[in-house]
Every structure is written in C-alpha cells, then in structure tokens.
Amino acid sequence: MMKHNHLAGKRFLSLLLASALAFACTLPAAAVDPLGSGVMPTYDEAYYAMLDYYGNLTEGSVVKSYTLNGANSISDYGKYDSVNNLTDSTLHSTTGSKTTFDFGSTPPEHFYFEGKTTQPFETLPWTISMSYKLNGVPSNAEDLAGKTGVVEIDLNFVPNESASSYARNNYTLEAMAVFNQDDILSLKAEGAQVQLVGNLRIVLFLCLPGEEQHFTIEVGTNDFSFGGMTLLMVPATLS
C-alpha cells in the first residue's frame, strides 16, 4: 500500500537546475559586493523546483553556496519570497532585493542559504509537460496508483523562448525515471538508455541544447506505482 503513495506524493516530479560557474557568470558582478579590503566572496548556485503530476510548478528555491575568502559578511541580490540560513544561526537583513548576512568576527569558511522563489522557472531552457494513458486511454495521474495494464507516461520538452540565448544554446536536459524490476511486467522507452542496477531499471533520456523532444515510457504492471521523474539541466560544457 505504501508504494501507491509514491504517485500521489508531492515529490512526484522534481526538477533540478544546476548552475555551474559558466552560468553563474552571466549574473555575477552585481551579485556580490566587494568589501573595503578588496575581498570578494564567490558563490555557486542551483535552482530546485518541485512540479506536480503534469509539470506545473508547485515550489521553487535557489540555493547558494558562498566561499567567503576571509570576508565577514555577504550581500546577495535577488528577489526571494523568504530566505533560510542553511549553515548557522546568523540572521539576515533585507532591503529591497538586497539580502545581507553579517557574521561578525567569526565568519564561516563556507556559507549556504536558500531563497524561495518561482521566478527562475519561467525562464528555464525548456517547458515541461507530462500526460498519461492506461491501456491506450487518457487518464489522470491521480487515478493510476495500483492499476493493472500498460501505463504510458508521455514527456514533452519544448525549448522555452523566454530563456536566455545562452541557456537555450548551451544547456542539456537529462530526465531519469526508476522502476523496481520486481514490480513490473514490461518496460519500453524508445530513445532512452535503460540500465539495470540490482533490481532497479533506470530510464535515462537526453535533450541536447535547443532540441524539442517527446518521449514515452510504457510500463506493464499488475499494481502500478511510480516514484516520479528527476530532471537535470546543466551546461553542455563546464569549461
């Protein structure tokens, strides 16, 4: 019974947009204030989004990892609905789109914080949608848990014209689904790499920069359950 909840759970589809240094450098110089000593903290960031059964955003946040390089404060620029310190008990102050953490005389070497925001989702390199069928008949995702037959999961990735030209031309999209071999009768996923790891079948799809792709996963089962999709968007090159 517990496995049925996987389909109905909030984490049905998760999206991870990882911003490597090349991407972070498209917004950087204004993102960190140099201190009077000339010390400049540096950071990496990642955008995380939780989506519903069909690809609609339910929650999003930016997580930033700062290396302080001896600085005793950081000032970050970004519009966040809320800010969470993931490192220590240091409180933040916010003025407009500027968030400041002042660490006093004992700054950490590395500092992490989360800024809740949905804004980056609108400019991801792809728009994402999913739909479902049971034995060839369109079905609501919420109705599929525990069903018998062939379940089709249709994935649609369309380049987003609202994304920056850099993101559209440089980011790849990787989509992954995992199925327990003991719980399924058959698995078909054209255009995917399917790997067997222990009793798990891992389905991997890839979209190259600027590509529109439509993929289908077909699962034969007597008792359908699905842990969801994990999506990763990263630059095609890290140089």
Where are these regions (language model features)?
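Cytosol-facing boundaries of transmembrane alpha helices in integral membrane proteins
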Residues: 2-239
